[in-house]
């Protein structure tokens, strides 16, 4: 990947960051959709990939809809440029889904990104949907470890600015990294993540991940 192209992609991310709405910009939340992707060979390019959406009811956490798409991904894995690898497939998933949840949880970063526009923010700005970034590891910033009890959290910061939260979703279990994607406040994002978490990973993205593992195994046996 040449330097000139990377600079163009950085500019796209910086422009995206300017469009992020980091406040609650919706009326209600009754359903939440989890989105996830998996690759046949993550370090190869091009490679086959699958993306899934599982929609759950907020009150019951029971799944009410699921959808999977597959395609060839033809953009290399480059740290901090994940959106350019995954967005085409996520958009295909979004556009072909028959159910649109009130909020999308995306396995990745929102504004907790060096240029303020990770995959969750990129997807939100592109589609206009309400999105939250829920990642299993930290990409950017610094934070203290939250207390070991479920519901504890600390703020993820960079240069004194809050860019996300480190949230303990289960007692004595590794935290998740929550950040604003688009059209939501960090406070509400944290609240929704905790409301939807039975285990470490919130149910919408956990179920989306589990669905992908089943689909991927079946596909690779063919």
UniProtKB/Swiss-Prot annotation:
The top EC class, named as a word, is hydrolase
Positions bound to Mg(2+)? 36, 107
Give the enzyme's EC designation. Answer: 3.1.21.7
Q: Would I find Cytoplasm among this entry's keywords?
A: yes
The record lists the catalysed reaction(s) as: Endonucleolytic cleavage at apurinic or apyrimidinic sites to products with a 5'-phosphate
The site feature described as Interaction with target DNA is recorded at 77
Give the keywords, sorted.
Answer: Cytoplasm, DNA damage, DNA repair, Endonuclease, Hydrolase, Magnesium, Metal-binding, Nuclease
A Gene Ontology biological process in which this protein takes part is:
DNA repair
**Per UniProt, what is one GO molecular function of this protein?**
RNA endonuclease activity, producing 5'-phosphomonoesters
Q: Single GO cellular component annotation?
A: cytoplasm
Tell me the compartments it is located in: Cytoplasm
Is DNA repair a UniProt keyword of this protein? yes
- Named cofactor requirement(s): Mg(2+)
Q: Primary place of residence? A: cytoplasm
The family classification in the record reads:
Belongs to the endonuclease V family.
Function noted in UniProt:
DNA repair enzyme involved in the repair of deaminated bases. Selectively cleaves double-stranded DNA at the second phosphodiester bond 3' to a deoxyinosine leaving behind the intact lesion on the nicked DNA.
Q: What is this protein called?
A: Endonuclease V
What's the source species for this entry? Aquifex aeolicus (strain VF5)
């Amino acid at each position: 990947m040449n330097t000139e192209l990377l600079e163009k992609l950085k500019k796209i991310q910086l422009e995206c960051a300017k469009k992020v709405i980091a406040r609650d910009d919706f009326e209600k939340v009754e359903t939440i959709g989890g989105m996830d992707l998996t690759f046949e060979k993550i370090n190869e390019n091009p490679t086959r990939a699958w993306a899934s959406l599982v929609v759950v009811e907020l009150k019951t956490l029971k799944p009410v809809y699921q959808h999977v798409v597959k395609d060839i991904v033809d953009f290399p894995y480059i740290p901090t440029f994940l959106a350019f690898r995954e967005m085409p497939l996520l958009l295909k998933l979004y556009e072909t889904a028959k159910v649109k949840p009130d909020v999308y949880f995306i396995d990745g970063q929102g504004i907790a990104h060096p240029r303020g526009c990770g995959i969750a923010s990129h997807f939100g700005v592109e589609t206009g949907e309400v999105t939250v970034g829920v990642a299993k590891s930290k990409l950017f910033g610094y934070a203290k470890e939250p207390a070991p009890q479920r519901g504890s959290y600390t703020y993820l910061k960079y240069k004194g600015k809050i860019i996300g939260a480190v949230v303990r979703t289960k007692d004595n279990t590794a935290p998740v990294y929550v950040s604003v994607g688009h059209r939501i406040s960090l406070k509400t994002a944290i609240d929704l993540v905790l409301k939807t978490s039975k285990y470490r990973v919130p149910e919408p993205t956990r179920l989306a991940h589990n669905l992908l593992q089943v689909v991927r195994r079946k596909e690779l046996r063919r």
